Amino acid sequence: MSKFMNVVRSKVKEGKKDELMKKLKEFFDNMKGTDGLISMKLIQTGPNNMCTIGEWKDEQSIAKARDKMIAGLGTVRSLLEEISPELGVTDPVSGPVIMEDK
């Protein structure tokens, strides 16, 4: 079984970054101890653009945590700009790790 990663791209509304950071800190704290979660990171890819990255033991672990992650999104949804009508406020992708440099 291979590790599994998820990446969620989002764009914070103007003037809402501090509030978003506070809510995401609470979300990260809430996710601590989630079965199979190895790590979570937040990177800034532009002035208002961010990606949340999760590393998981396996695909089953992320599947079990999906409801918890969706609930976390619910706490920040109002702070995010719509990326597009098709995507909404997030652009999530996930998949197995196929190469890793240790």
Could you describe each region identified by the protein language model?
Residues K11-K22:
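Short, surface-exposed ligand-recognition loops at beta-strand->loop->(often short) alpha-helix junctions
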Residues S2-F4, G33-T34:
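Short, flexible segments with low predicted structural confidence
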Residues K13-G15, T45, K57-E59:
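Short coil/turn motifs at secondary-structure junctions
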Residues S2, R9-K11, I38-C51, T75-K102:
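Glycine-rich beta-strand-turn "strand-cap" elements at beta-sheet edges
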Residues D18-L20, T52, I62-K64, K102:
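Short acidic, gly/pro-rich beta-turn/loop elements at beta-sheet edges
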Residues E26-S39, E55-D91:
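An amphipathic, aromatic/His-enriched active-site/gating alpha helix that lines ligand/cofactor pockets
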